[in-house]
Every structure is written in structure tokens, then in C-alpha cells.
Amino acid sequence: MKAIIFLFAVLTVVAIIIPIISGEPNAGPLAASIDLKQIMEKVKPDLLKMLDDIKAKIQQG
């Protein structure tokens, strides 16, 4: 159950961050004040590893 909740939390964060990275005009004031692309390039490998870990936990049951 914890894995499912964690998965939704990660997906929510990704859903918020992806539009900001892609430079959507409605990304909000954050996109203007912070260079999130640079931050995401640093965080992306960790996020991908986290998602792989979640998949493994779900498959294990």
C-alpha cells in the first residue's frame, strides 16, 4: 500500500515539474524566477532510479 501512495506522490511531482521544464507559458512565476531546467537535469537520474525502485517493489508485491 505504501508503494502505491509513494507512486502517486512521485507522479504528482512529475506532473507538476514536467510542464515547467518544457517551458509551458502557464507554468507560473516559479519558471521565471528559478532555472528549473538545470535543477531537473541534476535530479532526473535520481527520479528515474526512484521510479525503477518503485516498479521493482510493486512487482515483488
From Swiss-Prot:
Q: Which GO terms describe its molecular function?
A: toxin activity
Write the record's keywords in alphabetical order, separated by commas. Amidation, Neurotoxin, Secreted, Signal, Toxin
| Record flagged with keyword Transcription | no
Which residues would be cut away as propeptide?
A: 24-33
GO CC, sorted alphabetically, is: extracellular region
Q: Which residues carry this modification: Glutamine amide?
A: 60
Q: In which tissues is it expressed?
A: Expressed by the venom gland.
Provide the leader sequence positions.
1-23
Q: Does the keyword Zinc apply?
A: no
Report the main location listed first in the record: secreted
* Cell location: Secreted
- Role this protein plays: Toxin that causes a rapid and irreversible paralysis when intrathoracically injected into insects (blowflies). Does not cause spontaneous nocifensive behaviors by intraplantar injection in mice.
Other comments?
Negative results: does not exhibit hemolytic and cytotoxic activities on HEK293 cells.
Q: What family does the database annotate?
A: Belongs to the formicidae venom clade 2 family.
Protein name stated in the entry:
Myrmicitoxin(1)-Pm5a
Q: Native species of this protein? A: Pogonomyrmex maricopa
